[in-house]
């Protein structure tokens, strides 16, 4: 069904602190827990999943650029860059790879500055507020769209 698809999972700043950073907002799972679970799901779907996390905007942009011609779909939790990064937006537009924006928390139930995303209007879809399960939904949605 999904043979040979390559999906890139990108996680932005401070997500390396998951499990200990504001667990009442982001949950108790670590980023490694989420990635391991998603990798197992990807394997079951016969999809190659590559993961990269960085606290540096330029490193995420470089990964997006390198994905051009090599990746079929991007799943991205841009974290705080959601609300600030025109550069990340331009990189995603530049490579023309479909992507799904993911947020662990419901950004619309939080501070007003979190209500704006520079990425949502160019994303295939946005998943927020469903915790780590949102990553699974995004993976399945990407595979469905590619199949």
UniProtKB/Swiss-Prot annotation:
The active site is at 26 (proton acceptor), 103 (proton donor). Pathway: Metabolic intermediate biosynthesis; chorismate biosynthesis; chorismate from D-erythrose 4-phosphate and phosphoenolpyruvate: step 3/7. Its EC number is 4.2.1.10. It is an enzyme of class 4 (lyase). Pfam families: DHquinase_II (PF01220). One of its GO terms (biological process) is amino acid biosynthetic process. Keywords: Amino-acid biosynthesis, Aromatic amino acid biosynthesis, Lyase. It catalyses: 3-dehydroquinate = 3-dehydroshikimate + H2O. HAMAP family: AroQ. Catalyzes a trans-dehydration via an enolate intermediate. This is 3-dehydroquinate dehydratase.
């Amino acid at each position: 069904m999904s043979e040979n698809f390559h999906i890139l999972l990108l996680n932005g700043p401070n997500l390396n602190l998951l499990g200990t950073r504001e667990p009442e907002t982001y949950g108790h799972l670590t980023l490694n827990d989420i990635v391991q679970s998603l990798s197992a799901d990807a394997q079951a779907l016969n999809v190659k999943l590559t993961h990269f996390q960085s606290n540096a905007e330029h490193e995420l942009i470089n990964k997006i650029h390198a994905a051009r011609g090599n990746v079929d779909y991007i799943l991205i939790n841009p974290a705080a860059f959601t609300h600030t990064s025109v550069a990340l937006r331009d990189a995603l537009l530049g490579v023309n790879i479909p992507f799904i924006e993911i947020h662990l928390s419901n950004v619309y139930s939080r501070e007003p500055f979190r209500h704006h995303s520079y990425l949502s209007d160019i994303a295939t879809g946005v998943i927020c507020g469903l915790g780590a399960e949102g990553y699974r939904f995004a993976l399945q949605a990407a595979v469905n769209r590619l199949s």
